[in-house]
Amino acid sequence: MTSKQYEASSGQRGAVVVHAGENISLKEALEQWTVTELRSLASAYSVKAPSKLRKEPLIDAVASALLERDRMREVLLALEPEDWGLFHRTEEAGTYRPKQSEGGCGLALQRLGYLCRIRDGGKESYTVPEEVRAVYRELAAEGFCTRKERADLIHAYAMAASNLYGVIPQGDLIRIFNTQNGKKITEEELFSVLLRHISLKCGYALWDKYLVNDAFEANDYRDVPDLLKRVGGKPRYIPPKQELLKYADPDYYERTPEASLMRHYLLQDADLEPDLAEGVLSELHFAIVLEAKPVQLLDILRDYEVPLLGDHMQIAVSYTHLTLPTNSRV
């Protein structure tokens, strides 16, 4: 499924099925969808001429496409860890009531028909339709979970490298992975994972022989050569595996003493809300990754209306001149 096809279905969430118990058929779940929603999903699954189908044959066509083994395998392999975890827990438990922290998870799976919401006794839970569960268990019996774990690890390395370095030669990413893991990765295996996630606009992209953060796409990657020139021959900072993988989260930055001082300044002196302060720090960190000049970092602070007068200016300027560990890379 391409990014465009996925987006065609991304506006739909699927209706809630009023149902007691965990056993719900795929047809029963899809019957709650409107014809417009079903046609959108049918288009995403490349069903021929969905606009000409009425609801019942449309449901049959969508269900048939949704249950294709190869398609289900690719969809599940492309899931981000949070969505995959939700699917796996729900499939194992039969029904699963999401925690408050999981409120944003599961939407992609609902939109694609692999997960549905049920209401039983006034409370909503998730369940996996019976036919979907049956096909998934066939995949699991063939070792799918091991393959998924491996693919997610490779994806996490790609996310971490693109967030930490901004741009990295693909060969260097392979060397870092192979240095930190017992089972080595090949170029072919790397590309199969990268292309699957890039098609869904995951956060990184391929440019020439480099893996780059997809933020460069905004100006058609014209800043990539400039960044490569500025980092020159600097030795790359490579954190230990567990620290490196923290950078798979695009909002993560290393809590250096300097970063802690800046966070304290934003919270106490600039009086920013905690979430906003973290957002400012994340943006500053990424700008540092891209070798931004101190004046550009100060511009970020001005954009957030952070006071830059007197002692405040001195603190901000001191921070923007600091060389963080992540500022040394090739």
Identify the role of each PLM range.
Residues 77, 125-138, 194-235:
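Charged low-complexity interaction tracts in eukaryotic proteins
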Residues 94-97, 165-171:
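Short capping segments at the starts of secondary-structure elements
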Residues 105-114, 182-208:
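Charge-enriched amphipathic alpha-helical scaffolds
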Residues 196, 213, 220-300, 304:
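C-terminal helical accessory/scaffold domains
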Residues 320-326:
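Conserved small/polar residues in nucleotide/adenosyl-binding loops
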Residues 24, 69-72, 149-167:
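Positively charged, polyanion-binding regions of nucleic-acid-associated proteins
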Residues 101, 172-174:
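A short acidic, leucine-rich amphipathic alpha-helix
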Residues 2-128:
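Basic helix-extension-helix modules of the SAP/HeH family
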